[in-house]
Amino acid sequence: MTDVTPANAARIGIGGPVGSGKTALIERLIPVLQARGVDLAVITNDLVTKEDAERLRRSGLIDPSRVEAVEAGACPHTVIREDPTLNIAAGDALEARFPGLQLLVFESGGDNLASTFSLDLVDWWIFVIDVAGGDDIPRKRGPGVLRCDLLVINKIDLAPHVGVDLEGMLAEAARVRGGKPVIATNARAGLGIDRVADAIGRAVLFTP
């Protein structure tokens, strides 16, 4: 029998502004994807700490050795877009450590609406915004909102408390994105997480 070298793990990015719920989304996605048999690992990016990585390692949701941290310095977008070599190296190290790895999740440091991922780093990426940031975020048409493969609007439970018209915000997001997918979530409560996992599966894991 001829030996077959396994394909490299699929690589996805999760970006968005500070406090939008990126880490909370990952914490909810990990058990859902693992329950579907997905072998995964996570690379976090913080400015000068490893705070998000340590949070995931302490969570009990994933083997701590499957979480790597990249310290991005003053510009979190640089290490996911202009020069992603640190993240690429971290991903390669995890693939070498876990040969059966199917999915690598790269969490960007908190950034602004201009944050995007290099396609040298990821195959597909999610941008997370939240209703507390205001329902005008989709109208501002930042590159993160427009170019991501999936836009997640998080913290939808807060909409009535911050005066946001959630249905209008979702409709505006769908309009400016030209029909590309938008999913509403409450990551802390687990609402919408299965839909995000489904989107990841269809896009990069080739599940129905």
UniProtKB/Swiss-Prot annotation:
Q: Name one GO molecular function term.
A: nickel cation binding
Biological processes, Gene Ontology terms:
urea catabolic process
Cellular compartment(s): Cytoplasm
Keyword list (alphabetical) reads: Chaperone, Cytoplasm, GTP-binding, Nickel insertion, Nucleotide-binding, Plasmid
Residues that hold GTP according to the record: 16-23
Q: What is its main location?
A: cytoplasm
Q: How does it assemble?
A: Homodimer. UreD, UreF and UreG form a complex that acts as a GTP-hydrolysis-dependent molecular chaperone, activating the urease apoprotein by helping to assemble the nickel containing metallocenter of UreC. The UreE protein probably delivers the nickel.
What's the stated role of this polypeptide?
Facilitates the functional incorporation of the urease nickel metallocenter. This process requires GTP hydrolysis, probably effectuated by UreG.
The Swiss-Prot or TrEMBL record describes its family as follows: Belongs to the SIMIBI class G3E GTPase family. UreG subfamily.
UniProt-recorded name of the protein: Urease accessory protein UreG 2
List the top taxonomic levels of the source.
Answer: Bacteria, Pseudomonadati, Pseudomonadota, Alphaproteobacteria, Hyphomicrobiales
